[in-house]
Amino acid sequence: MYKCDKPLILASSSPRRKAFLDQLGLEYSVRVKSIDEFAQPEESPEAFVCRMALEKGSAVSYQHPDSWVIAADTIVCLDQKILGKPRDSEDAVAMLCRLAGRSHTVMTAFAIICEKEKISEVQLVETSVYFSSFGEVEARAYVATGEPLDKAGSYGIQGVGALFVRKIAGSYSNVVGLPLAELVERLLYYSVISI
């Protein structure tokens, strides 16, 4: 549907983010630099996720100054506390049990950076997700599938984890890990892509 008019790099190894860009028909390369992903003392979830997206993008953009770099970070927040990727299966079960029967917020920040053009921006998108009530047995059965172990909040809305979701308010693609409508709008604005 879209074509790239400028060199584009995705600074993420996420298969879900890659799939979204593939669905748009974009040509891009993938470059990833690891960074320390720890919240600063007193840093809000919003500030943390924005900083992570910018740091991931900047680390790649520095080495590819002529390219346009997209980077993103996604977190799940419950009661203003960040639920990242689970450490192990037990941590995943505990997270899911905390989310059961409640609403939480999924925040994805994406950064668009081009060193050559002196462009560096970040945008935060929030989606409310409402979980149905379920118990530890259901949480353990889901964790046993292996699906939640690499996902913020210990679930994947695009997979079996959708069984827990009663409703969402906001962007579905944001919950998966990349708010497409907002991203495409900015890439069109900078003439990085066109129809």
From Swiss-Prot:
- Which keywords, in A-to-Z order, does the entry hold? Cytoplasm, Hydrolase, Nucleotide metabolism
The processes (GO biological process) annotated in the record are: nucleotide metabolic process
Transcription regulation recorded as keyword = no
- A Pfam family found in this protein is Maf
Using the record for this protein, list the coiled-coil segments as residue ranges, or answer none: none
Q: Where in the cell is it found?
A: Cytoplasm
Q: Which reaction does it catalyse?
A: dTTP + H2O = dTMP + diphosphate + H(+); UTP + H2O = UMP + diphosphate + H(+)
Q: What is its EC number?
A: 3.6.1.9
Q: Which InterPro entries match?
A: ITPase-like_fam (IPR029001), Maf-like (IPR003697)
Role this protein plays: Nucleoside triphosphate pyrophosphatase that hydrolyzes dTTP and UTP. May have a dual role in cell division arrest and in preventing the incorporation of modified nucleotides into cellular nucleic acids.
Q: Which family does the record claim for this protein? A: Belongs to the Maf family. YhdE subfamily.
Q: What is the name of this protein?
A: dTTP/UTP pyrophosphatase
